[in-house]
Amino acid sequence: MRTEDLNATWAGSLLDRLRGHGVHDVCIAPGSRSAPLALAAARRADRGDDLTLHTHFDERGLAFYALGLIRASRRPVAVITTSGTAAPNLHPAVAEARQSSLPLVVITADRPPELHHCGANQAMPQEDLFAPLVRAALALPPPEATLCGHWLNRRLDATLAEATGAGATGPIHLNVPLREPLYGGTEHPPVAPPLPPRRAPRAAAPPLGPAEPPQLFVAGGLNPEEAEAVLETAAAGNIPILADPSSQLRLRAHPCILGGAEHLLATAAGRAALGQARQVVQFGGRLTGRRLPAWLTEHAPQRWLITGDDHDLDPDWQATTVQADIATAARALRPAAPQPPLPGLTEALTRVAETRSAALANEPFAEPAATERLSRTLPPGMALFAGNSLPIRAVDLFAVAKHGNPCVTQRGVSGIDGLIATAAGFAHHHPDGVTLVIGDLSALHDLNSLALLDQARHTCVVVVLNNDGGGIFDLLPARSEGDDAHRRLFRMPHGYGFSQAAAQFRLPYWQCTDGDSLEAAHREACTRPGGSVIEVACPPGAGSEQMANLFRTLEAL
């Protein structure tokens, strides 16, 4: 068989196996060494094999776009790149996929062995490039006729199962060396073995022991089905839920759901009311705030953490961790009868809400009020994507629970990069669209990914809270280093706006300086298909100062 035919056959087998393991989306960056893989994917997409191609010129943004596709579809997604520096550009997204247990299939084309360690162009060690982060890696040999059938497919099956099987998942890496010629090949499909059975779903949690009311639930990172199961059990037992933004419950109005746990725990009355719980059950990990994890460590006499991940999500090592299917485990905890309300909790919540409303009414327009306004104008079904750093804290503290909108977060490693790309990918599979709320540094990090919004088929509104630098550092001890060091080394003001960036990528743009103009712009943007940009001018330091002042007021109650 000719080399080009071997390349085409090898690549075709790989794409067929991906499809057999549930991959419906393939993301492709431009490159020549990866041509056989890209062409094999295109052939299958063009002939209607239920495979969708996504292309982008920037590998870094493309990989984050794939994470958005995964978060919305909850299916594995493949990313194909050429050799050389293209592959390391995937590293930030692979790290996020690892920490968030997302089934990202990374496929890197490579030079064959004879072109390594000899000064050949665009050749670098790639086999172990993502080794600490991936669940499995497969370094294939160059295509060989004798290996095209059962050997290749069995190796692919074993590796792909780590990303696509039932139970805990995560990223995998396939390194595919290919010899020239890379173009003009004809596929000769080998006889392939049948797909192996999927891994059995994770079993339900073992009994947690007898429930000791009063109970308290904490909802961390959950998918919609898990969140619904937790809420069903809580409603049946009148059990309060401290809901993180990533829980899918934070924006839902329900008597059991307590949003803004950080504010509640800042008050003595709130801590006293919650402290009456004798058993705390946490579903999912990666909590956003600082007060809630600290309170759990100090208070919870009997604390369980139920997680679907196969790595620890309890940084303080205080909880009894149960690895189980979260939805099944939550339903298994359904109590026979509701528990009485925690004394003093309703009164504490009312005081917090009144204090928060008064603070917003009396302060200049900044990140807290902007976040509150955005949450009120979200159409039903539209997802709110809370960017990292200051925006997710503002969502946690100030968002209003209304329609129960999905809330998307990227808290695996909590980076500020790739957020626009991830939102664009999420919007592709979420017909109700998404509003992304990010800071100006996050927007500058991922400016290239605005190109992905130009091709978005569903609404994707990017709201940039522009406070001219890293506003989160106003809340951190970096401030104690003095104003000059704080400004030069941490906040790093830049003076940039985003109107010309929006114009460069042919996106509708609004600039807002108050709540009314923000609401009007957001309502209009939410009616438009495709991408748009809303820039909110926030006075530097104002939002973080308002947050700090509100905490001081609550602590004094």
Swiss-Prot record:
Record note on cofactor: Binds 1 thiamine pyrophosphate per subunit.
Native source species: Halorhodospira halophila (strain DSM 244 / SL1) (Ectothiorhodospira halophila (strain DSM 244 / SL1))
Lineage: Bacteria, Pseudomonadati, Pseudomonadota, Gammaproteobacteria, Chromatiales
Task of the protein: Catalyzes the thiamine diphosphate-dependent decarboxylation of 2-oxoglutarate and the subsequent addition of the resulting succinic semialdehyde-thiamine pyrophosphate anion to isochorismate to yield 2-succinyl-5-enolpyruvyl-6-hydroxy-3-cyclohexene-1-carboxylate (SEPHCHC).
Disordered: annotated span: 183-206
Quaternary assembly: Homodimer.
Pfam families, sorted: TPP_enzyme_C, TPP_enzyme_M_2, TPP_enzyme_N
Record gene name: menD
Cofactors that this protein relies on: Mg(2+); Mn(2+); thiamine diphosphate
Protein's name in the database: 2-succinyl-5-enolpyruvyl-6-hydroxy-3-cyclohexene-1-carboxylate synthase
Annotated family: Belongs to the TPP enzyme family. MenD subfamily.
Record keywords, A-Z: Magnesium, Manganese, Menaquinone biosynthesis, Metal-binding, Thiamine pyrophosphate, Transferase
